[in-house]
Curated annotation (Swiss-Prot):
Sequence similarity: Belongs to the bacterial ribosomal protein bS18 family.
GO biological process, one term: translation
Stored InterPro entries: Ribosomal_bS18, Ribosomal_bS18_sf
Protein name: Small ribosomal subunit protein bS18
Pfam family, one: Ribosomal_S18
Self-association state and partner proteins as the record states: Part of the 30S ribosomal subunit. Forms a tight heterodimer with protein bS6.
Any one GO molecular function term: structural constituent of ribosome
Amino acid sequence: MAKVINNRNRKPRKKVCILSAKGIEHVDYKDVELLQRFINNNNKIASRRVTGASARMQRRIANAIKRARFVGLLPYVKE
C-alpha cells in the first residue's frame, strides 16, 4: 500500500516580500507598476498573507496605494 502524505501537519512556506528582496525601503505612490502587484482583480489591496510583506511594508504599500488613488493614478473600482 502506498504511503499517504499528510499535508495538514506540513508548515506552509513563508512568502518572501518582493520589496525586501529587491532592497526597496521607500514605496513611491507614483510607481504604478509596483503598486499594481499589490492589488487584486477587484482593485482591492491584497492582504499580507497574499503578498508576503511585513507589517511595516504592508502599511507603507497601503498608504501609497491610497495616495495614488486620491491623485488619480490608480482607480478605486474595477471598470
